[in-house]
């Protein structure tokens, strides 16, 4: 499988959708002003963010539907629980399209959930870091929903090509609650 050069891969397993340079490209000033934000710290946080992204994908109706539709009976039986099938995490190795969007998704989640909370002054709601948390959270949520709605980036069979059966766009109806 071909992975983007900026994904962190070890032993053929994707660990992170982003590397340190991706964060510098997104918001270099935060790293210049905060010397404690080391490459190791950021890439470890990006690995955690990648795992959280995959866990969130697992909870979507899109992933549950595609798994139940395309999984073999053996795969379904192996993941069966007492009442419903347990849907496993999608494999980061099988993401074949929109890989740059997954890099952006990882960067946004890492910045708003790990990096900025370390340096933000939450006593001052007008601080730039607190506002950037909100900006990156919004970008993350919008891009995540766009990827799920697109539904055409995952190679379920792992054979290196995405077939028409594996492409499953969805439509999410957002409901306003008053």
Regions picked out by a protein language model, each given a short descriptive name:
Residues 1-100, 155, 159-178:
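Conserved short "hinge" loops at termini or chain/domain junctions
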Residues 103-116:
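Extended, hydrophobic/aromatic-rich amphipathic alpha-helical segments that build helical scaffolds
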Residues 115-126:
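Short helix-capping/linker segments at secondary-structure and domain boundaries
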Residues 124-145:
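Short secondary-structure subsegments characteristic of cysteine-rich extracellular domains
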Residues 143-154:
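Amphipathic alpha-helical coiled-coil segments
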